[in-house]
Amino acid sequence: MLTTTVDGLWVLQAVTGVEQTCPELGLRPLLPRLDTAERALRHPVAAELMAVGALDQAGNADPMVREWLTVLLRRDLGLLVTIGVPGGEPTRAAICRFATWWVVLERHGNLVRLYPAGTASDEAGAGELVVGQVERLCGVAEAAPLRPVTVDADELLHAVRDAGTLRSYLLSQRLDVDQLQMVTMAADPTRSAHATLVALQAGVGPEKSARILVGDSTVAIVDTAAGRICVESVTSGQRRYQVLSPGSRSDIGGAVQRLIRRLPAGDEWYSYRRVV
């Protein structure tokens, strides 16, 4: 694992010639004509990168770091994970796959972490790898003893404006006392931690988004005092629903795989290769 700053990652990009990593993380852009390797190596953070072995004394990047950056540059598919905790600054992470290699890039404020996640050549292996990385980012927690709840997403958006209207809406759905309490906690960002996952596919999106297609649904992992809850966006017919269920590892893994399968790559998500 390499831990550095946003500027440190910029230096590594300039030295390796990797023009783009994960724009969804809001990182410092690299301007190839201006941000040369020579200019980057004059940045004070270059000395820190040399001290940890990411750069050698000649200013060359460690081969392993170069490989990690190449996976980000040439990624075929990935997940964007946004994590929020009460009173804390959000963390964003991109879990990226190129061919059979997976790499993770995290950003928390000015700090970034770059590390390999492993390799996988089949769907079972890739699914286990992805849910393992999601669990690594979110931590391990007991599943909440929640009897599953399904709500109409459009009705929810139309009816709910604040905590009071949320409670009224949930009561109209005939939730029991435990369901009402847990769903209310999950919806309150001051009482729960949230991680939202969105799937990304490279090579098929519009030019304005660097040909990255962003999936049209999400999975959320919510940690409450009662335990972990999984929230999955589901479309049935012409209606959109939010399904809340106990956040066990297997339930989250299934929801994440269904999320990725909704990309154009479909069932080939673990082996899809983008056309350059």
From Swiss-Prot:
This protein's record includes keyword Acetylation: no
Subcellular localization, as worded in the UniProt entry: Cytoplasm
Entry keyword set: Chaperone, Cytoplasm
GO cellular component annotations of the record: cytoplasm
Family under the similarity heading: Belongs to the EspG family.
Protein function: Specific chaperone for cognate PE/PPE proteins. Plays an important role in preventing aggregation of PE/PPE dimers.
Protein name, per record: ESX-2 secretion-associated protein EspG2
The species this protein was found in: Mycobacterium tuberculosis (strain CDC 1551 / Oshkosh)
Gene that encodes it: espG2
